[in-house]
Amino acid sequence: MQISNFGTFQKFWSQFSSRIGKKESYDAKRFQQLISSYRRFPLRAEPARNDGNFSTPPMRDFDKQLISSGRRSASWGWGSNGNALRPASGRGDDKEPNFNLEVPPNGYAWWYIDGVEPNTGQAVSIIAFIGSVFSPWYKWSGRKKPQNNVCLNIATYGKKGRFAMTDRGDSALIQEAHKLTIGPSSLTWDQTEKKLVIEIDEISSLPFISKLKGTITLKPTGITDVELPLTKEGTHVWRPFAPTAEIDVDLNKPEWQWTGHGYFDANFGTRALEQDFDYWTWGRFPLKTGTSCFYYLELRNKKQYQFGFHFESDGT
């Protein structure tokens, strides 16, 4: 996922809504062209296709230079030794996720899960938002109350992939230490089995408007105890809970019952992303010995930072 140039979303939304209002027929290619006409459009998910063929969106070219690496430091220190990770603290999630945290005005919290079936290439991503950073309504509201813009975003990739992202108000949100409920969907951390259970009950968007329902279970091989502050002030934090995991997908669509490799992280912030970042992107790469991750940042002050980390299967 890459995030930047957030103002373009409002322009895109007005054009797309206008086309829907005129009852123009939906065409995935036209929709993709509309998206690609905006530089660094914030949503990277492609329109769903029914032929099983997905073209990879063009990625940005980066200068070839050494990526910092390292494990952790006691404080924020992006030094030449690359020791940027620090012990996770302040949210009660150093050993397991805690969904019952306070998200301040102008802030956000999201929990991200993805998984890939290595043989077919099918994939899924889920993001649970409090203070949805993709929501134009959250921005238009002045970001006064993050709890009033919550959603569970799910995207499936492969034959007849689906996309769902319904913005809901605070009445749809229930926060408990080990369970996050957003409308009819929920994330539950099973303390006994040490696994994350995601119950999905959503409606997918164009072109396949239909009920998207089922259960996705993520079983980490280990939980890390570290986080990466993305700014010196700590206004944005990346918390890689389970870089290595097994995932079981059971959705109410033909051929959408599979297992594969998974991933689980979270991001927390006390300021809007566009206040501090021009651009960021990240990636995770499963290996025999665990998972390697990279993080690339461009701050509003034009400084650039690159990080690379390897996490063993047990989270160390």
How would you name each of these model-derived features?
Residues S25, S37, N50-G52, G107, ...:
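Intrinsically disordered, low-complexity N-terminal regions enriched in serine/proline/glycine
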Residues I3-G7:
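Short, compositionally biased, intrinsically disordered N-terminal export/targeting signals
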Residues G21-S25, R39, K194:
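Short, flexible coil/linker elements and helix-boundary hinge sites characteristic
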Residues R60-T316:
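Structured soluble/peripheral alpha/beta segments that form catalytic or ligand/cofactor-binding pockets
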Residues T8-S14, S18, Q33, S37-Y38, ...:
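Generic detector of N-terminal low-structure segments
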Residues Q2, Q15, R19, K23-S25, ...:
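A cross-taxon signal for low-complexity, glycine/charged-rich
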Residues D27, R44-P47, S73, E117:
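Residue-level detector of intrinsically disordered, flexible termini
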